[in-house]
Each structure stands twice: as C-alpha cells, then as structure tokens.
C-alpha cells in the first residue's frame, strides 16, 4: 500500500543532514553539498512506511524544502561513503527519514565517559598504577594513565614515553623523525565552511535571505572603515563575508529595533571581531566608532506599545481610560532615548566622564528649559557653575537629535517627557551641589527648593519625593494652569474691545492640570506654613490654598 507524500511536521531546513551526519560536521557537509550544482535524484524513492517520493516531485523541488534537502542527501557522495563504511545500502539507511518524530532530536547523549566505550575502567587502571608506583595511586596519575591506556589500547605507564610513541607511530623512522607533523585543523575547516557559505548565499535561491543579512552587515562595514581590513562589500573579501554570514546564520542576526541592533552588534564584537583580527592581523588606523551611533533611532519605535490612536485629538484607550498621547510615554522608550543621548554626548564630549555628561545634561535643560519650540535657539555649549567644576558641555548633537524626534512626534513634548523620567537623578544632583533655577510661576518657592523650578514638573516621578516637594510641585502645576487661563481670558477681552467676537473658533483652553493632579488629596495640616509662604501676595483664591493639588503615582 502506498501513501501520498507530505512534508513531515516541524521540519526545518538542515534537519536531514543533522540527523544523518550528526555531530558538529553536518553544517560543513550541507554547505559543501549545496554549494555545487547537482542533478536532482532521478528515480522514485520509497520510504519504509510505504510513502513514495516521485521522480517528478524531486524535479520540481526548490528553495529550502524537505524534498530538495533529501535530494541533496541522496546525491551527495559522502552519504554513499558513510553507508558503504557502515555496510548498508543507502536506500535502506535513508528510508525512515520521513518519520522525523521517531528519532531523538538531541545531538548529545549523556553517558558516563569513564565506562562507556572504554577498554579499561578506572578500577583496573588504579590497580595497574599501584603496581608500577609502589602501591601509591595519585588521582592525577590515575586519570592520566586511564586516558593514555584507552587511547593506545593497552595499559601503559604514563612515564614510558618511548612505548607511547612506538604505539602511536608504528614505523621507527616516523617515530624518530624530527620533522614538523602536519595535523588536520578544525580552524581551517571552519574557514572552508565560511567560503562555502559565501558561495551558498550568492545563489539566486538565497537572494532574499542574503539581502536581509546585508541590511544589517552594512553597519558592520561602516564600523570596519577605521581599520586596515579594506572591506567595503562582500565581493572585496569572500572569506570575511562568509564569516559574517555565518554570524547571521548562527545567531539569526537581522536588522531590528535600535536596542536589538546594538545587542546583535555586541555579538559581533565579542565573538567574530576577535576572529577577524586573528585571521587577517587587522589593525585600527583610527579609533573604532561608538556602536550606538551606527544605528538610527526611529521615532516609531518609541510608540510601538501604544494602543490605537485617534488621529483627530491624539487620544487613545489605556486600561479602560481615555488618555492623551502626551500623558503616555513608555519606560522602554525613555531607555531607548537615554542610550542614544549618551552616545551623542560621548561623541561631542570625549573628554568628559559619564557622570559629568549627565550632570551637564540636567543642568542644561534646567537653565534652557524643555519647550518644544523657541524663538531663540538654545546655546550649543553650556558652562556649568563653579560648584560643578565649570566645565563646558557641548549639547549640539543632542539638540539636533531632539529636534528631529520632535518633528516626527508633534503630539509629545519629547525633551520634557524624557527629562521628567530622569527627574529623580536630576534632583539628586541639584540638591547635592546646591543648584537652583529662577521661578516659572508667581509662587514664592523657598531658595532651598529652587531646584524644583523646572518646566517638566508635570512629568516628575513622584516616588521618593518628600511631602514638601510634592506640595511645591503640585502648586506650581496649578499656578501655571491658572496663569494660562488668565492670559487666555485677557486675550479674548482685548479681541472683544476691538470689535471681534471673543472665543470665535476657539474650542477652549487646554487644561494644563494633569489627570493625576485632578485626582488630588488634601495635604496634611503640617504643610500649612509652606502653603502660606508659597501663595503669599500671589492673590490666588483661598479655596485653592486650603485644598492644593497633590499628585499620586
């Protein structure tokens, strides 16, 4: 009874070669088989369960399919050599290949190497060592003797080097020869595999996968430009290309998100760059570039986890609540930006240490603020105050990055959101070195709390702040909203005086008070003195003083 052939479930390209040849050699053998154009298997093939793979099916096989790999296995000369060595017909050896689930998929078997396949066990070797060593059996000597004896096929004294040489080198001339011995090298086999892999990737059937690999590897080429390797394209050096394709094949290295790209590049730096340096004696003519600058950070990555957005008013549904996009920014997004910003700070300020770079960053945006747009551009350089060392930090690259990011994300104040996410770090610096900023509201913020006069107050992380700090930030937020409302009312009044219809086409002033602030709680009574100081001579309504806003996180 015959059955129509169907591809086995869970089959993947290379599985047949791995199952037949096993070990670590199957990849090299498969590359060798695929690198040469071979005729398809020209007969029908019957599997042991009655399934027939027709000659026509072999002829029509393409791509990375079961039939094409099976055809390669059938026509590969080394398959026949292995079967001949084992004394079995090739058709008989391969007739169960369509039943993949019947075989153990693991390449490794856990065995006791001290007993399985050994002519001499540890016990017998221990007794032998005692006889030749004055009834003393040191563990290291026993281990050495056990290895030598099982290698040579007889119990051998580890100190008897002449006997060992005579057993290994059968001829006297060879045993006494001083010529350099030539041995096979898995190192050379690997390089040969890389050359075969380069040829395989250049086959038309692999053009799609090759283009995906090349999309990532062009960044490797950019990285190597500062070296003397002179590698600008795969055709410049097929061996280098093969090594890089091996990395892509082994670690599924494709161009992805910003952080994933950096992670993949770390694999190249730790595993494959040392290999290239050893094979080609590569040297650096100029310092290697910062990996973080090789890849662009796409604005779309920052909002990958945001649910569907209403493009009309930039709102979306999040945890059963309607929220503005401005109020939502993933911690993952902040981490992406932080990695990119630090790379730009490092590039533009190579003489500054990590701590100096970020102290300068926080002070810069404390002084120049974080508004989306400005009539006067922020200074490219900023000199820090004496308490912080009076060093100069170059912020031009960071500003260009934020400008481009802001254009692509107009609904979000990128600088403000990002600085708010790092507020705990910034406030720690400001408090330690006594850094403060001019007020941004009418409030009388005490001098010791002047570091809270930042314009990203709405996005400050509330965790870890004192009760006084929470009170000040909440009242700053309220007073800014109050001033915006008063300014809008005054503007509309002037329009009315000019005979224009006030509020014409106006949909209302955007409520600057955050959703967190609206769900406020009454501040403890021991903060009354601070509230009186904040609102003294400001003219705010009494009910606001008695029930100030306080955000919870």
Swiss-Prot record:
The superkingdom of the source organism is: Viruses
Annotated compartments: Virion
The Gene Ontology CC terms held by the record are: virion component
Alphabetized, the UniProt keywords read: Transport, Viral movement protein, Virion
A GO BP entry is: transport of virus in host, cell to cell
Query: InterPro entries of this UniProt entry?
Result: Vir_Hsp90
Describe the task this protein carries out: Movement protein that is involved in local cell-cell movement via plamodesmata. At least five viral proteins, CP, CPm, p6, p64 and Hsp70h are essential for cell-cell movement. Also plays a role in virion formation. Together with Hsp70h and CPm, encapsidates the 5'-terminal portion of the viral genome.
Name of the protein this chain belongs to = 64 kDa protein
* Organism the protein comes from: Beet yellows virus (isolate Ukraine)
């Amino acid at each position: 009874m015959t059955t129509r052939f169907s591809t086995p479930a869970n089959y993947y390209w290379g599985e047949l070669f791995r199952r037949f040849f096993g070990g670590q050699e199957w990849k090299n053998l498969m590359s060798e088989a695929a690198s040469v154009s071979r005729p398809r298997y020209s007969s029908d093939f019957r599997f042991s369960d009655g399934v027939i793979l027709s000659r026509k099916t072999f002829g029509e096989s393409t791509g990375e399919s079961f039939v094409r790999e099976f055809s390669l296995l059938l026509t590969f000369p080394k398959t026949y050599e292995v079967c001949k060595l084992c004394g079995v017909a090739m058709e008989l050896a391969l007739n169960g290949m369509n039943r993949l689930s019947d075989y153990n998929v693991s390449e490794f078997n856990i065995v006791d190497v001290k007993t399985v396949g050994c002519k001499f066990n540890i016990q017998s070797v221990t007794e032998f060592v005692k006889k030749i060593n004055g009834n003393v059996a040191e563990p290291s000597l026993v281990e050495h003797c056990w290895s030598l004896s099982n290698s040579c096929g007889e119990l051998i004294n580890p100190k008897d080097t002449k006997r060992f040489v005579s057993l290994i080198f059968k001829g006297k001339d060879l045993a006494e020869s001083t010529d350099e011995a030539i041995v096979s090298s898995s190192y050379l086999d690997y390089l040969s595999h890389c050359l075969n892999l380069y040829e395989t990737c250049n086959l038309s059937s692999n053009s799609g996968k090759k283009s995906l690999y090349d999309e990532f590897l062009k960044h490797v080429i950019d990285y190597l430009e500062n070296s003397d390797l002179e590698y600008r394209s795969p055709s410049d050096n097929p061996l280098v290309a093969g090594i890089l394709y091996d990395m892509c094949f082994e670690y599924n290295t494709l161009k992805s998100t910003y952080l994933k790209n950096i992670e993949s590049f770390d694999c190249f730096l730790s595993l494959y760059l040392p290999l290239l340096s050893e094979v080609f004696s590569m040297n650096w003519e100029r310092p290697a570039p910062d990996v973080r600058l090789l890849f662009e950070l796409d604005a779309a990555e920052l909002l990958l986890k945001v649910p569907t957005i209403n493009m009309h008013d930039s709102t979306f549904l999040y945890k059963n609540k309607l929220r503005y996009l401005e109020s939502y920014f993933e911690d993952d997004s902040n981490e992406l930006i932080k990695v990119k910003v630090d790379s730009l700070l490092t590039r533009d300020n190579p003489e500054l240490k990590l701590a100096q770079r970020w102290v300068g960053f926080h002070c810069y945006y404390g002084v120049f603020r974080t508004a989306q747009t400005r009539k006067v551009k922020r200074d490219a350089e900023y000199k820090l105050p004496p308490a912080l060392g009076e060093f100069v930090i170059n912020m031009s690259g960071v500003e260009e990055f934020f400008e481009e990011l802001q254009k692509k994300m107009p609904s979000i104040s990128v600088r403000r959101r990002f600085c708010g996410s790092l507020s705990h770090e910034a406030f720690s610096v400001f408090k330690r070195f006594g850094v403060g900023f001019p007020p941004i509201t009418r409030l009388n913020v005490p001098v010791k709390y002047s570091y809270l006069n930042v314009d990203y107050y709405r996005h400050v992380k509330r965790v870890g702040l004192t009760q006084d700090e929470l009170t000040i930030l909440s009242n700053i937020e309220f007073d800014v909203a109050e001033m915006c409302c008063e300014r809008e009312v005054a503007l509309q009044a002037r329009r009315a005086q000019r005979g224009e219809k006030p509020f014409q086409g106006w949909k209302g002033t955007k409520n600057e008070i955050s959703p967190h602030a609206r769900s406020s709680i009454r501040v403890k009574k021991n903060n009354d003195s601070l509230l009186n100081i904040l609102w003294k001579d400001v003219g705010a309504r009494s009910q606001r003083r008695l029930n100030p806003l306080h955000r919870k996180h």
